[in-house]
Structure formats: C-alpha cells, structure tokens
Amino acid sequence: MPEDQTLTISQAHYHFAVDYHGKTWELLDKPDRTPDDNQRMLDYAHASLAHWRTAGGAVRHQRGEWLLSRVYAVLGLGALALDHAQRSLEIHEGNKADMEDSDLPFAYEAIARAYAVSGNAVESKRFLDMAKRAGEAILVPEDKDLFLKELQGGNWNGVK
C-alpha cells in the first residue's frame, strides 16, 4: 500500500489485519526464532485478531482466534492456546451459516493441539480424531490439502 493512500477506518482495519496475519505466519514458519521473534509473533497475532474483530466478520474472527491459539501452542502455553481454540469453536458454532467447511476441522485441530501442549493426551487424541473426521468433509481439494498439512505439522508432544 502506498504511504500516501487514504483509507477508510474499515479499510485500514482490514489492511492491518491482513498485514499482521502475514507477519505472524512469517514468524511461525521461521525455524530459528529468537525470544524477540516469539514476542513479536504473539504481538502480531493479537493485533491481527483485534483488527479482524473490527473489520472481518465472524469467519475472520474465528480464524484469528485459531491463529492466536496456534501461536500460544507453538510457544508452549497450553492454557492460553486452549482458551483461544475454544473461542474459535464457539464462534464457529454460533455462526455456522457464515463458515466454510474447513473452519470446523481447524477449530478441532486447535483444541487438540492445545490439549497436547497442556499434556492432556486423552483429550488431545479425542479432538484430533474429531479434526480428522471433520477434515474428510472438506470439499475443495486445496483446502483439504492445506488442512492435512497443518494437521501433520508442528509439535504434538508425542500425541500423534
């Protein structure tokens, strides 16, 4: 975006949500994050969620909660990861008509991962199975592939 471009408040929120979302993923994908990288990643995820809550509707809010859950899980903060994962599922459940078929499997995956980070293998496996079953219902092949890739990645603390 050019520096001199004028945006409405809504457009600015959308712009920053997208920007911070991308910056969060850049750091999530970075193999050798420093403690400062981890803090910036967390800050970016919170900023992205804040902007999505203003400009993105239920779908983006749900996905922002999912992303924040993933960041907390990567940082080993299971209780916070679980809180945001459960919010992701609650938003999905309250807005099913607005969601895509990949949103439910991702919400289950976030809960499973949060339980894994928290050391609760039983609940992690339960939600992992739910995520896998829900993932089978994803109709768009690219979305299904993305979900399965995310499901396979990351640290599952021995659950998988």
Task: Label every PLM stretch briefly.
Residues 6, 25-26, 46-53, 86-96, ...:
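Amphipathic alpha-helical segments of tetratricopeptide repeats
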Residues 9, 16, 40-41, 61, ...:
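Residues that mark the junctions of alpha-helical repeat units in TPR/alpha-solenoid scaffolds
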Residues 13, 20, 27, 44, ...:
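TPR repeat positional signature
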Residues 22, 67, 103, 110, ...:
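"A position-specific structural signal for the A-helix of alpha-solenoid helical repeats
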